[in-house]
């Protein structure tokens, strides 16, 4: 259900991105030439890049937010932003260019798009669980009654956010110093790539179809559930 809710949050951006991608690649040569020469194609490509290339961002925010809303956490939006911060912390911040030069201090769109989707799903659930647990255990800073609600919510989220970021920093350090990689790269190589091989097989397609049909039979939106899980893998 949480994955289905996340799909609903994410799909609006993907539909808009798809529309602009279609405009940039209209199968009419005369129109396509005008779009390309006028610079409209570059604008459409930028819109596409800012939607499809940020799918992992939308995913981690959507899953964390849906998890916390399901647990009736009032400061769910703060938890969702914490999930985003955790995701950025655990993904590569450098990239080697074709020239061999290494660029640091960046957020690579390679990892905010398809490559980072499984990592985003895992982080979304992990952050949602820890944040919700902190709220249930009343691990927060309480402010006096006269303090504005916005300020009080910020302080009440301080300890859960600090705990989550500290845990993610430890995970980052373990991956960096022991495995010489990042958490996102580790997940991609250990989980996502092998799963791609399974889902590309004949039996994988059969299993996906059966599971989707069973979900529909029980009254659950099989397309949203299976799509939310399988589209990142594919």
Language model features by range: what are they?
Residues 12-25, 58-66, 83-94, 121-132, ...:
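Hydrophobic core segments of alpha-helical transmembrane domains in multi-pass membrane transport
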């Amino acid at each position: 259900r949480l994955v289905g809710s996340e799909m609903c949050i994410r799909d609006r951006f993907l539909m808009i991105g798809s529309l602009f991608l279609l405009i940039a690649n209209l199968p009419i040569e005369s129109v396509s030439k005008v779009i390309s020469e006028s610079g409209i194609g570059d604008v459409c490509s930028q819109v596409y890049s800012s939607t499809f290339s940020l799918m992992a961002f939308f995913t981690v925010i959507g899953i964390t937010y849906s998890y916390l809303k399901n647990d009736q956490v009032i400061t769910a939006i703060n938890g969702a932003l914490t999930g985003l911060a955790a995701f950025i912390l655990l993904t590569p911040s450098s990239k080697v260019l074709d020239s061999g030069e290494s660029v640091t201090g960046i957020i690579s769109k390679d990892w905010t798009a398809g490559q980072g989707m499984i990592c985003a799903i895992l982080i979304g659930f992990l952050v949602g669980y820890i944040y919700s647990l902190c709220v249930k255990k009343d691990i927060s800073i309480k402010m006096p009654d006269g303090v504005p609600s916005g300020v009080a919510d910020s302080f009440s989220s301080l300890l859960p956010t600090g705990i989550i970021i500290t845990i993610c920093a430890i995970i980052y350090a373990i991956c960096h110093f022991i495995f010489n990689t990042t958490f996102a790269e580790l997940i991609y190589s250990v989980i996502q790539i092998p799963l791609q091989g399974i889902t590309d097989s004949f039996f994988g397609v059969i299993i996906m179809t059966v599971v989707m049909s069973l979900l529909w039979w029980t009254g659950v939106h099989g397309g949203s559930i299976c799509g939310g899980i399988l589209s990142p893998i594919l």
